[in-house]
């Protein structure tokens, strides 16, 4: 039996509500070679140990703010450092759009205006080639008088993953 290598582990802050768990499920569909670990009451140290045991490169933690996805943190498990830290301004889930999930085998970068988001997508396995299952596209928009970055996962103008709106935020932090 062939088992693919796990590159990315997705998890949430403790005891995440249904909307955040659904968001995590949808992320595992649009990021190739990724899995979701239910955090429950496990410590961050336990989640990091499981991620390292799975030989994954990155751990993505979705923090909860007022019952919704609130922060998108990407840890590099080689250096054990926080690599990306974005505030999530809002998400639109596929279930809210009444669309079905499609498992993505190869993701490509389309038009992305923000360099930090582009670098994060490259680190999380998205590449620059022509023929892909999904393309990550994004641009700055004004939403509720705020300047945010909207990221969409699409192919042929069909949305294949959650729509994520980021307020860009960055800070180095060690996870030890």
Swiss-Prot record:
- GO biological process assignments: rRNA processing
What GO molecular function annotations does the UniProt record carry, in alphabetical order? rRNA binding
Tell me which InterPro entries the record gives: Brix, Brix_dom_Rbsml_bgen_prot
Function, please? Probably involved in the biogenesis of the ribosome.
What is the protein's species of origin? Answer: Sulfurisphaera tokodaii (strain DSM 16993 / JCM 10545 / NBRC 100140 / 7)
Q: Which domain of life is it from?
A: Archaea
* Protein name as catalogued: Probable Brix domain-containing ribosomal biogenesis protein
What PROSITE patterns does its record include? BRIX
Keyword vocabulary terms for this entry:
Ribosome biogenesis
User: Which intervals hold domain Brix?
Assistant: 6-176
């Amino acid at each position: 039996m062939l088992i693919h290598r796990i590159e990315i582990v997705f998890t949430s802050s403790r005891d995440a509500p249904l909307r955040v768990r659904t968001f995590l499920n949808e992320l595992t569909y649009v990021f190739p070679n990724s899995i979701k670990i239910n955090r429950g009451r496990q410590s961050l140290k336990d989640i990091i140990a499981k991620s390292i045991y799975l030989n994954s490169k990155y751990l993505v933690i979705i923090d909860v703010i007022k019952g919704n996805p609130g922060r998108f943190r990407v840890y590099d498990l080689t250096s054990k450092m926080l690599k990306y830290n974005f505030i999530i301004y809002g998400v639109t889930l596929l279930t809210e759009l009444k669309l079905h999930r499609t498992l993505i085998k190869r993701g490509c970068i389309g038009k992305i205006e923000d360099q930090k988001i582009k670098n994060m997508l490259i680190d999380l396995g998205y590449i620059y080639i022509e023929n892909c299952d999904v393309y990550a596209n994004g641009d700055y928009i004004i939403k509720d008088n705020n300047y945010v970055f909207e990221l969409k996962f699409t192919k042929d103008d069909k949305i294949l993953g959650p729509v994520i709106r980021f307020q860009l935020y960055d800070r180095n932090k060690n996870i030890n």
